[in-house]
UniProtKB/Swiss-Prot annotation:
This is Acyl carrier protein. The lineage of its organism: Bacteria, Pseudomonadati, Pseudomonadota, Betaproteobacteria, Burkholderiales. The keyword Cytoplasm applies. GO terms for biological process: lipid A biosynthetic process. GO terms for cellular component: cytosol; membrane. It comes from Burkholderia multivorans (strain ATCC 17616 / 249). Pathway: Lipid metabolism; fatty acid biosynthesis. Keywords: Cytoplasm, Fatty acid biosynthesis, Fatty acid metabolism, Lipid biosynthesis, Lipid metabolism, Phosphopantetheine, Phosphoprotein. 4'-phosphopantetheine is transferred from CoA to a specific serine of apo-ACP by AcpS. This modification is essential for activity because fatty acids are bound in thioester linkage to the sulfhydryl of the prosthetic group. Signal peptide: none annotated.
Length: 79
């Protein structure tokens, strides 16, 4: 597990109140981890803060799983 993946999972755990060990990469924020629409907005904001990036709304709507969040962060994080 790389640093970005660990950081994303830590944020997901903190935002959704789920144990990090229970977070699978393919898990859906809504269907598997119990997030509602407010949770997903807060999750996107936390990812933006953690990685120092801006996630446009149309992109944020496409991030529905842990792996998609990891992939987005990897592609857009400023090294």
């Amino acid at each position: 597990m790389d640093n970005i993946e660990q950081r994303v999972k830590k944020i997901v755990a903190e935002q959704l109140g789920v144990a990090e060990a229970e977070i699978k990469n393919e898990a859906s924020f809504v269907n598997d981890l119990g997030a509602d629409s407010l949770d997903t907005v807060e999750l996107v904001m936390a990812l933006e803060d953690e990685f120092g990036m801006e996630i446009p709304d149309e992109e944020a709507e496409k991030i529905t799983t842990v792996q998609q969040a990891i992939d987005y962060a990897r592609a857009n994080v400023k090294a």
